[in-house]
From Swiss-Prot:
InterPro entries: DNA_gyrase_B_C, GyrB, HATPase_C_sf, Ribosomal_Su5_D2-typ_SF, Ribsml_uS5_D2-typ_fold_subgr, Topo_IIA, Topo_IIA-like_dom_sf, Topo_IIA_B. Few gyrases are as efficient as E.coli at forming negative supercoils. Not all organisms have 2 type II topoisomerases; in organisms with a single type II topoisomerase this enzyme also has to decatenate newly replicated chromosomes. This is DNA gyrase subunit B. One of its GO terms (cellular component) is cytoplasm.
Length: 637
């Protein structure tokens, strides 16, 4: 806390020249994700101040005209003259790429992003940036246009405040798709940061509306509160999430975990507040410790051990069934790898997390035998189901001479084999499936009709999912496998299209299928492969003409446009089976004319809550959710 933070703390690595030419290299894209990344970069700097112990309040404001303001009460960016650059440190941080106080590890031991990179990239990709700094009893101001300072830092007077305010307007010539920020997208990330940093209050305010909208996050319980938030509305063990904290060799480890009454695991892992969606060595260490400790205690419990076959052990997926865990690691030099650079590669972290978690879990279970017994019983039940599923699969393979997940007989496959050019329609019922088969382009479009009883996977363990008469054909058709066997590179179609009727039953089937994809195949949603077909609600025919419309509003507008002509006929489609192959092709399957909705997972935490509410056991939260959201539904009752 006593180390001086001044201009000499700022290390400069290179200039800004390339940023405007190749912005995607610095912020990932110039679409909506890249636009929001500007905010994250600035907020990350505030979080770095908080992690260093100097900031406890961060405010993000969306102003009129797509202007963003981010304010913190940290030490303020240094404004004294930089020893090597000859201008103020503030100007260096805003105009030099890789200039910041993070590189010498003195001003900041740990940082969630590269301080200086973020601010300078925001400056390079904005029409203008204004910075106000409060430090050393004074207020300082500097403005930049397209990355260049308009004047040196100006001292504006005396102030007792402390901190930094950064305002900017993103450049629409860079962000051609949109420069409008999405409140909910920012809310998701800021809520996550507040959970991960329990000492900080984070406020998000939207002043673009007639009445300003504001949320404030403050979670003194930190990641323990995060786990409770993820598990709300569920029956849980233990009642209060188990919390583990410790450090070794400058690696700080925090874990909070709790089991719920479902069967899917919910693992959220972070390194320096960065969401490591692809996992990494920290997560490997946690999983290894949890499985080892569970098996160690099982050996000491002969009564429980008898419940699984001799020579069999609990495996990771048994022990993690129904587990919600948040793992947060903070390290000085993270090495990221993987497709999206969200996988931790530091080999030393695995052992540190493994030993710390193993030691603390052992101590906790020794002191809480009741909790241990409940967790072991759940894990054993999962192991029994897994072994039963394996035996059934092996028996089916011996009987048929092939893998029991061969392509289903009712699949009408397409002739092309390039997944990027192929799509599969998942259709409820043989009648709609028949129309779809007649109307499709057999070169690129496959049709999978579903039959039998649809399973609610929210209340079901994996062995039943794998052998359900409706879900097994989907798993076989997609080709990715499921669970530990999942491999996205084996997917056979890059468009998986759910096509169901527009009535209550169709909506229920869509929800059940989306629950299945979210719980067991979330990677294909994240890859952008899942879509909802939008069949028309009405066919309007008049004077040898016809028009298909997709909502009551479109119907009313069309009828008003047609006027009071005689012979206008309006047909309401109750189900897909009412359309013949040609009509289904023209309205719902023709890539040139069809309407589809891509299923996007922008907020996994909120998605988890919605699926748990809609498909879980507890009736009251479901009733409340339906009452609050009924206005948004489009159902034919």
């Amino acid at each position: 806390m006593g180390i001086e933070y001044s201009a000499s703390s700022i290390t400069v690595l290179e200039g800004l020249e390339a940023v405007r030419k190749r912005p995607g290299m610095y912020i990932g894209s110039t679409g909506p994700n890249g636009l929001h990344h500007l905010v994250y970069e600035v907020v990350d700097n505030c979080i770095d101040e908080a992690m260093a112990g100097y900031c406890d309040r961060i405010t993000v404001v969306l102003e009129q005209g797509n202007v963003v303001r981010v304010e913190d009460n940290g030490r303020g960016i240094p404004v004294d003259v930089h020893p090597h650059e000859g201008v103020s440190a503030l100007e260096v941080v805003l105009t030099k790429l890789h200039a910041g106080g993070k590189f010498d590890k003195k001003s900041y031991k740990v940082s969630g992003g590269l301080h200086g990179v973020g601010v300078s990239v925001v400056n390079a990709l904005s029409l203008w940036v204004e910075v106000t700094v409060y430090r050393d009893g004074a207020e300082y101001y500097q403005k930049f246009n397209v990355g260049m300072p308009l004047a040196p830092v100006e001292k504006r007077g005396v102030s007792e405040k402390r901190g930094t305010i950064i305002r900017w307007q993103a450049d629409p010539s860079i962000f051609k798709e949109t420069v409008a920020y999405d409140f909910d997208v920012l809310l998701t990330r800021l809520r996550e940061l507040a959970f991960l940093n329990s000492t900080v209050v984070i406020q998000l305010r939207d002043e673009r509306l007639a009445t300003a909208k504001q949320v404030e996050f403050a979670f003194e319980g930190g990641i323990r509160h995060f786990v409770s938030y993820l598990n709300r509305g569920k029956s849980v063990v233990p009642e209060r999430p188990l919390y583990i904290e410790g450090s070794k060799s400058d690696v700080l480890v925090e874990v909070a975990l709790q089991y719920h009454d479902g069967y899917t695991e919910n693992v959220q892992s972070f390194v320096n507040d960065i969401n490591t969606r692809e996992g990494g060595t920290h997560l490997e260490g946690f999983k290894s410790a949890l499985t080892r400790v569970a098996n160690d205690f099982l050996k000491k419990s002969p009564k429980l051990a008898k419940k699984i076959e001799r020579e069999e052990k609990l495996v990771g997926e048994d022990v993690r069934a129904g587990l919600t865990v948040v793992l947060s690691v903070k390290i000085p030099e993270p090495q990221f790898e993987g497709q999206t650079k969200t996988k931790l590669g530091n080999s030393e972290v695995r052992g540190i997390v493994d030993s710390l978690v193993g030691e603390r879990l052992t101590l906790y279970f020794e002191q809480n035998p009741g909790v241990l017994t409940k967790i072991l019983e759940k894990s054993i039940a999962e192991a029994q189901a897994r072994l039963a599923a394996r035996r059934a699969k092996e028996a089916a393979r011996r009987k048929s001479g092939m893998d029991s997940f061969g392509l289903p007989g009712k699949l009408a496959d397409c002739s092309l084999k390039d997944p990027a050019k192929c799509e599969v329609y998942i259709v409820e019922g043989d009648s709609a499936g028949g129309s779809a088969k007649k109307g499709r382009d057999s070169k690129t479009q496959a049709i999978l009709p579903l039959w039998g009883k649809m399973l609610n996977v929210e209340k079901t363990r994996l062995d039943k999912v794998l052998h359900n008469e409706k879900l097994q054909p989907i798993i076989a058709t997609l080709g990715t496998g499921v669970g530990k066997d999942f491999d996205l590179t084996r997917i056979r179609y890059h468009k998986v299209i759910i096509m169901a009727d527009a009535d209550v039953d169709g909506s229920h089937i869509r929800t059940l299928l989306l629950t299945f994809f979210f719980r067991y195949l979330p990677q294909i949603i994240e890859a952008g492969y899942v879509y909802l077909a939008m069949p028309p609600l009405y066919r309007i025919a008049w004077s040898k003409k016809e028009l298909y419309v997709y909502s009551d509003t479109e119907r009313d507008e069309a009828l008003e446009s047609i006027g009071k002509k005689s012979g206008v006929a309006v047909q309401r489609y109750k189900g897909l089976g009412e359309m013949d192959g040609t009509q289904l092709w023209e309205t719902t399957m023709n890539p040139v004319r069809r309407k589809m909705m891509q299923v996007v997972l922008s907020d996994a935490v909120e998605a988890d809550r919605v699926f748990s509410t809609l498909m879980g056991e507890d009736v009251e939260p479901r009733r409340k959710f339906i009452e609050e959201n009924a206005i948004y539904a489009r159902l034919d009752v």
